[in-house]
């Protein structure tokens, strides 16, 4: 796991939490929850790759891991679209920077998950 990605996740979540305090947007709450879920999934997949040979454990624990992987990619695509939309409509520079960083992070995480999944297949 790239330490920069981990700190990026923490930074984005902290920034979104600050934005959440200033707004009552349920969409933002959902985005934060999905970011947290995505981070946990990415971390667990990365740990499985690091333990190589853990594929059988992963498959036994979750026989539908490929389906789950597909769902995570759908979540990432949804988050990318949601972040792009937010970026277009916000005029607040703090929010713009946060959403630009979140977008970059999503692209990086999508690539990492693809790399991890190819190593597990």
Curated annotation (Swiss-Prot):
Gene3D superfamilies: 1.10.287.230. Pfam families: Flu_NS2. The keyword Cell membrane does not apply. Signal peptide: none annotated. GO terms for cellular component: host cell nucleus; virion component. Disulfide bonds: none annotated. A motif (Nuclear export signal) lies at residues 12-21, 85-94. It is found in: Virion; Host nucleus. GO terms for biological process: exit of virus from host cell nucleus through nuclear pore. Keywords: Host nucleus, Host-virus interaction, Transport, Virion. The keyword Transport applies. InterPro entries: Flu_NS2. Mediates the nuclear export of encapsidated genomic RNAs (ribonucleoproteins, RNPs). Acts as an adapter between viral RNPs complexes and the nuclear export machinery of the cell. Possesses no intrinsic RNA-binding activity, but includes a C-terminal M1-binding domain. This domain is believed to allow recognition of RNPs bound to the protein M1. Belongs to the influenza viruses NEP family. Average number present in a viral particle is estimated to be 130-200 molecules. Interacts with protein M1. May interact with host nucleoporin RAB/HRB and exportin XPO1/CRM1. This is Nuclear export protein. It comes from Influenza A virus (strain A/Hickox/1940 H1N1). The gene is NS.
């Amino acid at each position: 796991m790239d330490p920069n990605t981990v700190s990026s996740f923490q930074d984005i979540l902290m920034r979104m939490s600050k934005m959440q305090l200033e707004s009552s947007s349920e969409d933002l709450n959902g985005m934060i929850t999905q970011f947290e879920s995505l981070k946990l999934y990415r971390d667990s997949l990365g740990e499985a790759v690091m333990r190589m040979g853990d594929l059988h454990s992963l498959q036994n624990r979750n026989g539908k891991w490929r389906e789950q992987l597909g769902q995570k990619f759908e979540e990432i695509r949804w988050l990318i679209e949601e972040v792009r939309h937010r970026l277009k409509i916000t005029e607040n520079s703090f929010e713009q920077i946060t959403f630009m960083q979140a977008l970059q992070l999503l692209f990086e995480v999508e690539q990492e998950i693809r790399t991890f999944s190819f190593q597990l297949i």
